[in-house]
């Protein structure tokens, strides 16, 4: 029977001899179960397959078989006998059993009334004998059952076999279904009964010969021993079908009584709000094994008022019926936009786009708003005939300097007219013009113009002279091919601007500083049907000069924007491994203010919010009963179509694109919309062959083909260029990207941000659960509400973070495109800010470095170095290229120059006041202080440039001064404002601060167009010098102690308890430092009452603050908060607890005792399973797609991501996502915790919490790797404890942490050699001298000779040194394990010498391996390949390879001092002379007698040891190092 069960669900057979045989077997089995009869053999059940189940053929035979069947079956149709329309046509194809075809029968002898693809001839006689008498079924229900193959009404909508019926028969079927629905309305209780009835059929049952069962099953609904038939009360019609009766009979007979107990054994015990998962199973031996999760699961009911869905429903309640027309309605009323009195058009620009290739090259498209009465409508401005602007840098012979000076003087003296002067310049440049003309003609450029102009250049190209000079300006159309960027000629040395884009040229020439009002003086309109865009209006401008910035005396307000949030719900196609869309929710905010924040009350105002959802049923499922009525009711209630149903993904996409076009959105919002939703949307449109006239409505440009969607998208760079071109005209606001820029969070998922920022609890739905939600209207409504809620949350997050006004301010300051700012393009913002500034000063702008030029320069760099130089990237100081195209090299480049100065901290716990002083905006202030600019400092290829001698301010200092002065004025206004105006001003000052602080970064960013390494190096050099001079001033002149300094700040230990005296010192220091500088200002950033200083960039302190004149205290952490590291919440909580004890705990003894008690308490709670499971969750961010990790098997979060993606969870496990995991071991297999790697034992929290899970939290791992490193690091400077003691409190083996304790207490081994009080203390960390007996191979440790002799003379008990060794060995030179009378145990002097030499060689070899270990307790990275990155003051090769995740320093695991100490210990063991000199005369005589016998035996070994030690350079001092 078991064998039949294993195969019967996968196939169906017609009646015949096999069916009869199975029936006989079933009856015999029934008799056996009832009468206790056993077969004669007594061996249990005899189960065998008489015939093979499958035929094995190759592809050619299979194709021939299908063709033959199709030919034989041609014209074969089985009619249903009643209507003749429900027959089946056999096409000769094999059935694909991998596809679901409705609920499958588990009875092979009968298909239970199901239509499974082949119509079987049934014999009435057999049916009557096998099946009991049933009531007469309603004809309509019977017809429906024939269609769907199910005796249950709801399966008509979920059975895939229903899809196979011909399209021409739909009308008849719909009539039948309407009749059924009119007669029968099933309720939810019917579904539950039917579900309970079918549950036993889903339980895995394994039959063993000893009748013992081993299984784990869910406890849901397992109390009934017999299935309850489902009955529809309305018509008194029994819906029991043949399948369920026979199936239930068989299973109730086969399953023993103890099995039903087993089915309910997976129980949940609740204690208060916490749940403990307990799984109880029976083993094959009948012994119960109980597995209990060793952590609690929080089961507190969340406040329904804080539910995100509740918040969305509240917001949706504000949408009145009068607003229904807003969604999906076209513009009414006026059809013409407003014009000014002079006929010009006012146009507010939001976005711009240009086609880089094709026929439209050189044409740009501006998208924005025009005023139409009291409203604003979308408009597209097509700008044509934009000209290239290329500058040719002439050789010195073209414009001789002496002639130019004479001509300019004649013009100045009015002896030469300006026209004549220009004519002279043209004559000088004739040769240059002819050469350029020839180059243009070769490119088929027929229309161009050239003119000599005077321009400045001040950037980094060595082939372009710096300063003011005459160059040749070349203008020709963008439709023509560009001149090569590396083109040179006889009369010119370089070309600049040849590849500048038309859009950049237009923005700079027209001085457009971000979104603003433009004035279009001359234009032509076109109808929407003839236009190139989907905007409401479209105008064409033939010359860019017709567009100017609007200068209006009256204040012009910004138009509101239409903001649309999109959320997709997808399922995973497992065969193709792609995401498919099943629902799309759209939320539209019709009047969003873009320049000022919008508080919550204003956002909730009725009439500005609308929503829409379109859903389609997944393949193989249908819509639940009454779904159409539910949709109709929802639409009627809202007064418009807010819910639409479709039958295919293609139809869903078409409807979505149509609705988006009707909304005419300006901004698209979503969480990770640029990384997931937008990509999936367009990929599916492409796969479903959606017409370009439809999918292009996602943007505002009409398109005939889809751009390449995949492109070079770096981590955190937003959407790919292909995706951005598809939505051209609409801005993209990704709240995922924005939150990463504006917030510091552990996780940036929508769920976590909703909780931390909006105080809303979001419900997540797994992609694998979505198809199940189509089984009932209730769950399907839940799915739709979840999609709408997610869209609402992303929009609320955008408003909460004030993303639109902040990015608008940044864009208006910088003058770039708003869409780029929203995508996080910080470098481009600063780039455009400088482009606008230098362009207005008549400077030739630096070109972008193209990929081709990068490869050329990279090849040149590689050729400049010798082949054997493997450290090119580290030695190369000119890091022109950040992304080296040579993929083969994984070597990371070090910094091109030294960074900020970081002083070595004076570690310890300070209980007196500590001052933190820092310079305000150090690097921007240095630029102003020393007049550092492209235009003021001459640069050379080698060396750091000197400070400028010119007092004329450069362009960069002026920019900095301008930004700083504006910010100061804004901050002054903030003091007078409150409420919304204060909020608005605060956003503006933030934007100014971000721009000023980013200015220095562009100088040191190698991919920036304004990259200037000499300037960046000079700025950081001055910063280091300023910090050092400040430290010297404080220490030498003010006699204060500086305990730490970092880049722009210093910490001063006051040594005082009086806060007033500390304030006086603060004022004195600030005054003395600030009077030395003009622009640099130092200020107090904090007063700390108590501070724990651990190491560089790692400290914690109690910060004293004054609010309303009253002091208050708060703990401030830096580098010890463990927010962005792979630490669990438990580690963070224990770290915070230890910090609070240290910083508030009083005396050192009290602090240590409190920490020890807390550690023992938490250990007990963890061992007893009293810690919440959520506290064990570790989070780590994926920096790239999981499949792209080369070392994925050693990365826990990558392994979890890969496993979850295999199960269909695509969202949340991609690059930039934070993956949660718990380190576990399998229940009943505790040995796996030590044998399997960490990555193999990492599990997602949902995997651990799932019912039936066999995973337990690995408590030992969390104690040893999550808690001990954190606590030991925090307590490193606390007297009275040690890593060993902390480990003991946590129940760990203290011996494993002994070396760490020794390292902490004796960082310099020479200290213990010189100042130790005894030999035992001096050599306590050394390895013992171990000798091996040649006879019995026993190894034993040898004490020192002197201690062994003294012990034998005095007859005292063995010292600690000799406890683990034989104290009489040196007197007998005999193996302590061998018999004394046996001569085989004697160890000769040669043996001693050889074994000592071998051990010494091992220590020397260990030293020369050069193993490095990271000093950070939480990292402990071990390597033999040092990282040659330069970082601050650190020595080359000491930076941890895990930087920046780890800021630790690599240290030698076995240092030269360790080797010297070990060799000294061996010398001490074998010493027979020096130790005698320290003894009293009386004792010395006795010892000397014993030594005379031992000395010859160890002489050779002692000589070898001394010789090795003397060769160690550590024991020698070079006189050259101490002689002046």
From Swiss-Prot:
Intracellular or extracellular location(s): Nucleus
Comp. bias intervals (Basic and acidic residues): 20-30
Binding site for Zn(2+) 2: 1414, 1419, 1440, 1446
Any one GO cellular component localisation term in the record: nucleus
Gene Ontology MF terms in the entry: DNA binding; DNA-directed DNA polymerase activity; DNA-directed RNA polymerase activity; nucleotide binding; zinc ion binding
ZnF locations on chain (CysA-type): 1333-1378
Biased composition (Acidic residues): 79-96
Taxonomy, superkingdom: Eukaryota
Keywords of the record: DNA replication, DNA-binding, DNA-directed DNA polymerase, Metal-binding, Nucleotidyltransferase, Nucleus, Transferase, Zinc, Zinc-finger
Residue positions of motif CysB motif: 1414-1446
Residues where Zn(2+) 1 binds: 1333, 1336, 1375, 1378
Other facts noted in the record for this chain: In eukaryotes there are five DNA polymerases: alpha, beta, gamma, delta, and epsilon which are responsible for different reactions of DNA synthesis.
Name of the protein in its database record: DNA polymerase alpha catalytic subunit
Lineage, uppermost ranks: Eukaryota, Viridiplantae, Streptophyta, Embryophyta, Tracheophyta
């Amino acid at each position: 029977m078991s064998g039949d069960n294993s195969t019967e669900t996968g196939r169906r057979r017609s009646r015949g001899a096999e069916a009869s045989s199975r029936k006989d077997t079933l009856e015999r089995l029934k008799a056996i179960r009832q009468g206790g009869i056993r077969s004669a053999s007594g061996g249990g059940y005899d189960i065998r397959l008489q015939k093979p189940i499958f035929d094995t053929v190759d592809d050619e035979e299979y194709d021939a078989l299908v063709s033959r069947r199709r030919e034989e079956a041609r014209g074969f149709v089985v009619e249903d006998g009643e209507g003749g329309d429900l027959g089946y046509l056999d096409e000769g194809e094999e059935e694909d059993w991998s596809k679901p075809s409705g609920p499958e029968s588990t009875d092979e002898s009968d298909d239970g009334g199901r239509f499974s693809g082949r119509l079987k001839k049934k014999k009435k006689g057999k049916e009557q004998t096998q099946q009991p008498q049933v009531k007469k079924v309603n004809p309509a229900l019977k017809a429906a059952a024939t269609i769907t193959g199910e005796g249950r009404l709801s399966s008509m909508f979920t059975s895939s076999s229903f899809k196979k019926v011909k399209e021409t028969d739909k009308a008849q079927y719909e009539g039948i279904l309407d009749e059924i629905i009119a007669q029968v309305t099933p309720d939810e209780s019917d579904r539950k009964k039917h579900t309970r009835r079918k549950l036993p059929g889903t339980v895995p049952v394994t039959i063993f010969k000893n009748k013992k069962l081993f299984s784990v099953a869910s406890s849901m609904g397992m109390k009934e021993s017999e299935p309850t038939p489902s009955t529809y009360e309305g018509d008194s019609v029994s819906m029991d079908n043949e399948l369920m009766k026979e199936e239930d009979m068989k299973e109730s007979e086969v399953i023993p009584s103890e099995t039903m107990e087993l089915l309910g054994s997976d129980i949940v015990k609740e204690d208060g709000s916490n749940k403990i998962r307990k799984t109880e199973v029976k083993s094959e031996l009948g012994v119960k094994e109980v597995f209990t999760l060793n952590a609690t699961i929080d089961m507190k009911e969340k406040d329904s008022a804080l539910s995100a869905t509740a918040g969305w429903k509240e917001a949706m309640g504000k949408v009145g019926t009068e607003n229904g027309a807003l969604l999906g309605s076209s513009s009414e009323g006026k059809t013409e936009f407003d014009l000014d009195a002079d006929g010009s058009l006012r146009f507010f620009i939001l976005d711009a786009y240009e086609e880089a290739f094709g026929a439209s090259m050189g044409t740009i498209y501006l998208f924005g708003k025009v005023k139409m009465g009291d409203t604003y409508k979308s408009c597209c401005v097509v700008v044509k005939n934009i000209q290239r602007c290329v500058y040719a840098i002439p050789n010195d012979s073209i414009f001789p300097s002496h002639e130019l000076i004479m001509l300019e003087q004649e013009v100045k003296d009015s002896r030469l007219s300006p026209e004549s002067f220009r004519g002279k310049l043209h004559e000088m440049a004739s040769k240059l013009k002819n050469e350029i003309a020839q180059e243009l003609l070769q490119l088929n450029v027929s229309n161009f113009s050239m003119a000599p102009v005077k321009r400045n250049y001040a950037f980094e190209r060595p082939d372009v002279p710096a300063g003011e000079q005459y160059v040749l300006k070349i203008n020709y159309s963008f439709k023509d091919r560009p001149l090569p960027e590396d083109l040179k000629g006889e009369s010119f040395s370089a070309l600049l601007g040849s590849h500048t884009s038309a859009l950049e040229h237009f923005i700079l020439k027209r001085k457009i500083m971000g979104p603003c009002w433009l004035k279009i003086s001359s234009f032509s309109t076109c109808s929407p049907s003839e236009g190139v865009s989907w905007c409401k209006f479209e105008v064409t401008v033939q010359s860019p000069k017709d567009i100017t910035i609007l200068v209006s005396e009256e204040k012009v307000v910004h138009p509101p924007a239409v903001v649309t949030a999109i959320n997709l719900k997808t399922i995973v196609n497992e065969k193709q491994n792609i995401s498919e869309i099943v629902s799309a929710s759209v939320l539209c905010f019709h009047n969003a203010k873009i320049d000022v924040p919008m508080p919550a009350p204003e956002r909730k105002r009725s009439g500005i919010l609308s929503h829409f959802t379109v859903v389609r049923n997944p393949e193989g499922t249908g819509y639940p009963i009454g779904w159409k009525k539910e949709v109709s009711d929802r639409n009627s209630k809202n007064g418009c179509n807010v819910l639409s149903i479709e039958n295919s993904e293609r139809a869903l996409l078409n409807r979505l694109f149509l609705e988006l076009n009707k909304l005419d959105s300006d901004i698209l919002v979503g969480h990770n919309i640029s990384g997931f939703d937008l990509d999936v949307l367009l990929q599916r449109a492409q796969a479903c062959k959606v017409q370009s006239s439809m999918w292009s409505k996602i943007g505002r440009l009409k398109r005939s083909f889809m751009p390449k969607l995949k492109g070079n998208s770096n981590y955190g760079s937003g959407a790919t260029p292909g995706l951005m071109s598809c939505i051209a005209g609409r801005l993209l606001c990704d709240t995922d990207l924005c939150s990463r820029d504006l917030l510091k969070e552990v996780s940036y998922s929508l769920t976590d941000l909703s909780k931390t920022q909006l105080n809303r609890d979001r419900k997540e739905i797994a992609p694998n659960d979505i198809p199940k939600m189509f089984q009932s209207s209730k769950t399907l409504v839940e799915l739709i509400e979840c999609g709408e809620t997610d869209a609402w949350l992303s929009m609320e997050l955008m408003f909460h973070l004030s993303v639109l006004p902040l990015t608008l301010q940044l864009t208006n300051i910088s003058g770039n495109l708003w869409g780029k700012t929203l995508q996080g393009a910080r470098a481009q913002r600063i780039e455009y800010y400088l482009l606008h500034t230098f362009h207005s000063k008549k400077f030739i702008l630096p070109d972008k470095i193209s990929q081709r030029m990068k490869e050329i320069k990279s090849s040149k760099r590689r050729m400049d170095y010798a082949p054997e130089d493997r450290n090119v990237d580290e030695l190369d100081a000119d890091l022109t290229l950040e992304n080296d195209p040579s993929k083969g090299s994984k070597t990371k480049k070090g910094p091109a120059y030294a960074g900020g100065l970081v002083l070595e901290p004076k570690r310890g716990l300070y209980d007196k006041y500590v001052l933190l002083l820092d310079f305000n905006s150090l690097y921007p202030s240095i630029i102003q202080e020393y007049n550092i600019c492209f235009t003021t400092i001459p640069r050379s290829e080698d060396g750091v440039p000197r400070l400028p001698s010119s007092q004329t301010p450069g362009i960069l200092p002026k920019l900095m001064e301008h930004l700083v002065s504006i910010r100061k004025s804004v901050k002054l206004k903030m003091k007078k404002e409150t409420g919304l105006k204060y909020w608005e001003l605060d956003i503006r000052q933030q934007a100014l601060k971000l721009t000023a602080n980013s200015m220095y970064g562009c100088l040191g960013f190698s991919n920036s167009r304004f990259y200037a390494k000499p300037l960046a190096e000079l700025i950081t050099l001055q910063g280091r010098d300023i910090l050092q001079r400040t430290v010297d001033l404080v220490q030498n002149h003010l006699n204060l102690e500086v305990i730490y300094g970092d880049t722009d700040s210093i910490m001063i230990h006051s040594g005082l308890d009086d806060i007033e005296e500390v304030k006086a010192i603060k004022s004195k220091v600030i005054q003395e430092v600030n009077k030395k500088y003009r622009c640099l200002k130092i200020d107090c950033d904090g007063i700390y009452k108590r501070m724990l200083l651990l190491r560089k960039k790692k400290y914690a302190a109690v910060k004293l603050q004054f609010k309303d004149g009253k002091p208050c205290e708060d703990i401030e952490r830096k580098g010890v908060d463990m927010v962005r590291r792979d630490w669990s919440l438990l580690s963070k909580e224990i770290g915070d607890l230890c910090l609070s004890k240290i910083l508030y705990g009083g005396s050192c003894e009290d602090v240590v005792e409190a920490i020890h008690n807390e550690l023992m308490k938490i250990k007990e709670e963890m061992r007893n399973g009293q810690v919440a499971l959520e506290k064990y969750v570790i989070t780590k961010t994926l920096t790239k797609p999981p499949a792209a990790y080369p070392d994925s098997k050693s990365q826990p979060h990558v392994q979890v991501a890969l496993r979850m993606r295999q199960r269909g969870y695509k969202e949340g496990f991609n690059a930039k996502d934070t993956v949660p995991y718990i380190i576990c071991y399998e229940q009943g297999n505790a040995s796996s915790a030590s044998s399997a790697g960490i990555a193999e034992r990492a599990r997602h929290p949902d995997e651990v919490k799932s019912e039936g899970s066999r995973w337990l939290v690995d408590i030992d791992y969390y104690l040893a790797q999550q808690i001990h490193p954190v606590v030991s690091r925090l307590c490193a400077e606390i007297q009275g404890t040690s890593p060993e003691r902390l480990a003991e409190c946590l129940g760990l083996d203290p011996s494993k942490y002994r070396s760490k304790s020794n390292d902490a207490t004796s960082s310099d081994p020479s200290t213990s050699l010189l100042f130790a009080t005894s030999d035992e203390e001096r050599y306590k960390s050394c390895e013992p001298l171990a000798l091996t007996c040649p006879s019995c191979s026993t190894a034993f440790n040898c004490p020192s000779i002197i201690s062994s002799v003294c012990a034998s003379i005095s007859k005292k008990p063995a010292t600690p040194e000799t406890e683990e060794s034989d104290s009489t060995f040196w007197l007998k030179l005999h193996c302590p394990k061998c018999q004394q009378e046996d001569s085989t145990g004697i160890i000769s002097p040669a043996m001693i010498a050889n074994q000592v030499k071998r051990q010494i060689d091992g220590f020397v070899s260990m030293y020369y391996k050069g193993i490095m270990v990271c000093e950070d307790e939480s990292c402990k990275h071990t390597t033999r390949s040092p990282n040659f990155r330069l970082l601050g003051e650190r020595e080359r090769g000491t930076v941890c390879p895990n930087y920046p995740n780890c800021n630790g320093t690599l240290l030698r695991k076995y240092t030269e001092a360790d080797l010297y100490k070990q060799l000294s210990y061996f010398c001490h063991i074998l010493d027979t002379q020096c130790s005698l000199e320290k003894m009293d005369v009386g004792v010395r005589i006795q010892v000397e007698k014993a030594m005379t016998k031992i000395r010859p035996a160890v002489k050779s070994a002692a000589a070898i040891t001394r010789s090795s030690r003397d060769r160690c350079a550590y024991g020698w001092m070079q006189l050259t190092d101490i002689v002046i």
